[in-house]
Amino acid sequence: MTIKEYDKFDKANANFQALTPLSFIERSAKVFPNHPAVVYGENQYSWRELFDRTIKLASALTKFGIKRGDTVSILSANTPEMIEAHFGVPMSGAVLNTINTRLDSETIGYILNHSDAKVFIVDCELAPEAAKAIKTIKNQNIFCLLYTSDAAD
């Protein structure tokens, strides 16, 4: 079936569901709760587990004081925590600012200065470069959260 043929059908629950990233993860957790969502090395997370972890991150950010429109930056490789940030940060109402792990500390500092990040999430493996970047930023009130990629919670 081509897209043109598909588009001729009236939109109904059976053939159409508008999806934003947040409604996508919520729907996936309901429809496919036990199906794998993330496979990372030996670790595997179902859609339900990913959704639950995403809610925990959003809740933690909100309790910390992050509000709609605030910026949360993250310096991380493609890990499960990065996936959680892609859903959890917008779920809290904040804007996610992902920073390329190949950048030098001066450039990371520049990005942090111009993003006005309130929180900076950093993979522990990248902490030395992040520490150098933090020394260059004007906003000394930024909260830095370090995590390990193999953390279970």
Residues of each region from the PLM?
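Short, flexible active-site loop motifs that bind/organize anionic cofactors or intermediates
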Residues: 11-15, 40, 47, 98, ...
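Flexible, non-catalytic linker and terminal segments flanking ANL/adenylate-forming cores
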Residues: 1-18
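Conserved adenylation A10 loop of the ANL superfamily
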Residues: 33, 148, 152
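Structural core segment of the AMP-binding/adenylate-forming
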Residues: 63-64, 91-149
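Residues within well-formed alpha-helices
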Residues: 27, 53, 72, 84-88, ...
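Conserved AMP-binding/adenylate-forming core of the ANL superfamily
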Residues: 16-17, 22, 26, 34-79, ...
